[in-house]
C-alpha cells in the first residue's frame, strides 16, 4: 500500500520566539522599492518587510510613505522577537531612507547608531546614461 501523502499542515514550521534585545536594521532603499531586514548581531534574519509586500505596486512602492509602512511592519515583528535596541545600516539612494528610520524610532525601538553603507565604486563600471525628463 502507498503511504498517505504529506499535507502542508504537517510541514509548517512554528515560529520560534527568540529573545534578542539588540539587532541590526538593514534598510535597502533603491529607486524602485525599499526593503527592511532586521537581524541579530550575527546576521540571522528575525523579521523583514518591503514596500511592495505591503500592497504598494508600481511607482507607489518608491514613496517615503511605503517605506514607512514597511518599516513599521518589520519593526513590530522584531519587537515580538524581543528587539529593543537597533543599529541602522542604510544602503542605496532611494526615497525611503529617512522615513524608514523615523518609523522604527516611532515604534519605541531605541536607535543606537545610523550608518550609511552604500557601496561607492572606485571608478568601476560605467554608470547608466543620464535621464532626460
Swiss-Prot record:
PROSITE patterns reported for this sequence: RIBOSOMAL_S11 (PS00054)
GO cellular component: ribonucleoprotein complex; ribosome
Entry keyword annotation includes Aminoacyl-tRNA synthetase: no
InterPro entries linked to this entry: Ribosomal_uS11, Ribosomal_uS11_bac-type, Ribosomal_uS11_CS, Ribosomal_uS11_sf
Gene3D superfamilies the record matches: Ribosomal protein S11 (3.30.420.80)
PANTHER family named among the record's database cross-references: 40S RIBOSOMAL PROTEIN S14/30S RIBOSOMAL PROTEIN S11
Function: Located on the platform of the 30S subunit, it bridges several disparate RNA helices of the 16S rRNA. Forms part of the Shine-Dalgarno cleft in the 70S ribosome.
Protein name: Small ribosomal subunit protein uS11
Lineage, top ranks: Bacteria, Pseudomonadati, Pseudomonadota, Betaproteobacteria, Burkholderiales
Gene (name only): rpsK
